[in-house]
């Protein structure tokens, strides 16, 4: 199942999220909006497994990369008792 992956303009081009992704969903593309002149991009969201390792690896205060799980994934997680 594909999940929605959003990259925000707060990305500093550090490549931490790209290296953390186990399924190579993310890649860096040229961008003039930061010192690194690159920003994360998510061209292969159909391969996203929703592990959110990219979010954990992001060093910015406001996570620059976010994975939004679909309703199906949320429902299948169940309730904790």
From Swiss-Prot:
InterPro entries: 4Fe4S_Fe-S-bd, 4Fe4S_Fe_S_CS, PSI_iron-sulfur_center, PSI_PsaC. [4Fe-4S] cluster 1 binds at residues 11, 14, 17, 58. Coiled coil: none annotated. Binds 2 [4Fe-4S] clusters. Cluster 2 is most probably the spectroscopically characterized electron acceptor FA and cluster 1 is most probably FB. Its cofactor is [4Fe-4S] cluster. HAMAP family: PSI_PsaC. This is Photosystem I iron-sulfur center. It comes from Mesostigma viride. The gene is psaC.
């Amino acid at each position: 199942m594909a999940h929605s992956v959003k990259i925000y303009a707060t990305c500093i081009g550090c490549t931490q999220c790209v290296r953390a992704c186990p399924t190579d969903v993310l890649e860096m593309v040229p961008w003039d909006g930061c010192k690194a002149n690159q920003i994360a991009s998510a061209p292969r969201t159909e391969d996203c497994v929703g592990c959110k390792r990219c979010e954990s690896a992001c060093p910015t205060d406001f996570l620059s990369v976010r994975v939004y799980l679909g309703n199906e994934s949320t429902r299948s997680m169940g309730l904790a008792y």
